Amino acid sequence: MVLVTGGNGFIGKELVTFLQNDFTVRTSVRQLDGKCKALPPSVETVVTGDISDKTNWNRAIDGADVVIHLAGRAHILDDTALSPIDLFREVNTKATLHLFDEAVKNGVRRFIFVSSIGVNGNITHGKPFTEQDSPEPASDYALSKYEAEKQLTLAAAQSDIELVIIRPALVYGKNAPGNIARLSRIATRCPFLPFGLVANRKSFVSIENLVSLLALCITHPAASNQVFLAADTTPVSTKQLVNILSKVEETNTINFPFPVVLMRMAATLLGKKAMASQLFDDLEVDNTKARKMLGWKPCDGFD
């Protein structure tokens, strides 16, 4: 049996739907909501309440052979929490370690932790990120994920459980939340955007590609105790992404040429330097390891 935490989230819903044909699947959710109604009837849903280092996982984890841990505190731009790092650590680090401990106690064979490409960093300089790069988390969210990775690795070395860590690039797909949703709204509401000269290289991963990789990691023997970066093979620029989103929404957004350096300066003056980095800098990911080691075959591009 496979336990998927956060099964009513964007990734979780797609994952449990994909897995149900080949595995017995159970999912945990904080509370029953409208999103749970969209889950397949064959998938058992267990309510755990808020995720913390005191969560009772007994019912959810009972009989599980594999745990795929998706649930966590998401990376939200303009987070207004007084101490975001503490909140991220409570959910993404401490609660994850607690779940891992429960997995060990219950004889789980493999624990798959969905981390973030942010662990590697938020900018590449002519060379794509690989699994061999030294981590350089540049946000509180990424730091909390990296701290979880380190502690999971230490704990796994002292147990018989197999650990797999996945660091996805920004995930896109139908009804994707977060930054993709923001950019999509901008692309559909603004007939003209100043991205005509933006030629950066950004890696993304489709929800379908990420789900197929997670499914491979459930059973593939070579995945044991490995870290994999998850991304589509071909990066796109912000200009290309806006054009794609505009096409999907059947609008006609025009990207006109405007100096990128001036947009960076304006963003910095407005306190939006991080947003400018997301729009204009490179963040390229090399997916070679997963393709070669696991035989993963991601469909490419925003097809």
Where do the language-model regions lie?
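NAD(P)H-binding glycine-rich loop region in Rossmannoid oxidoreductase-like domains
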Residues: 44, 48-94, 98, 102-105, ...
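Conserved Rossmann-fold NAD(P)-dependent oxidoreductase catalytic core, especially the SDR/UDP-sugar
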Residues: 97-140, 156
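Glycine-rich Rossmann NAD(P)(H)-binding loop
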Residues: 173, 195-201, 228-235, 244-250, ...
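C-terminal amphipathic/interface module of NAD(P)-dependent oxidoreductases
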Residues: 274-303
